[in-house]
Amino acid sequence: MKKRFFALLLSLSLLLSGCTIYIELPWEDDTQPQTVSGDGLVVHFLDVGQADCALLECDGQAMLIDGGNVDDSQLLVSYLEQQYIDTLTAVICTHAHEDHVGGLPAVLAKYQAETVYAPVTEYSSKVFSDFVKYTGRQGLSVTIPSPGDTFRLGQAQVTFLGPVKQYEDTNNTSLVVKVVYGQTSFLFTGDMEKEAEHDLLDTEPDISADVLKVGHHGSDTSSSYRFLYEVNPTYGVISVGAGNSYGHPHEEVVSRLKDAGIVQLRTDQLGTIKATSDGSEITFWWENQNAAPEDVTPAGERYYVGNKNSKTFHAPTCGSLPAKKNQVLFTDYTEAINQGYTPCRGCLG
């Protein structure tokens, strides 16, 4: 588990007037911090309503992760123009749903990309077909990455972690992308749901990250307790539309994020959110200067609670915890499994 401390000047209340948050991230005592000499990593979480879109810039290179809805096409192209983007090192479509691929055909019609990634090359929708068509017009083919594939965006390392299996549910086919810059890291999961989260965790990758783009717009189909425990982020960015018909983010997810001590930054409240990393510190800025993320209580040591009698183990916030005398604590999910305990279907299912 990553070490954490909140040299974040945390209390947020001291910082909210400027709408900027600073965090410094520690490293293990027996290692030296990885240094970077570039211009920094900037991650723009665009406010595209009930959709996803992130622009990443590092050392003069840029890439997109998802492109919002079709109706966001002009917004996205205009935003790239405002950032003086000329070409894209990579365009990543996490999965084929319209609220992730929608604006990418317009981007590919205007901007040359070096590589275009997606989990599939065919899908039964016009917008995805347009995405493939405009990729082809650049003389490129859509690349389906494998877990472990990496590339560089300036001095940032981009690694594909999933999906680790084949799925019928399109959400679970989402590409899982980790971006590391110096001692800081960001994790993008598209709309990956709990089934794929657990399959990914079973492969024991390093999914720890300082900033998590919360999966599936904060739907309760994603962001399981176990997944949040293993990622152990300080911040969770939720890309979501105000008053959306899905009720995102679901209260269950908001509660789990709070229980985990994760600061929630929501595009429906803050507008476009920008995170800047110099390799050791992350600074946040957001568009709506009259709003601020809710303060949180930093989480203590994280653990699982086992029931000695039923041999079931739970999240510490579960409503079905055994009496104290029947409890056994585990610091790791795998430890509980190895000792013959079964995860609670209610809180860890």
Where are these predicted regions, by residue range?
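Non-globular, low-confidence helical/coil segments that flank catalytic cores
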Residues: 2-5, 16-300, 320, 326, ...
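Immediate flanking context of iron-sulfur cluster ligation sites
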Residues: 307, 336-338
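Short, solvent-exposed mixed-charge patches
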Residues: 348-349
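SH3-family beta-barrel domains
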Residues: 297-311
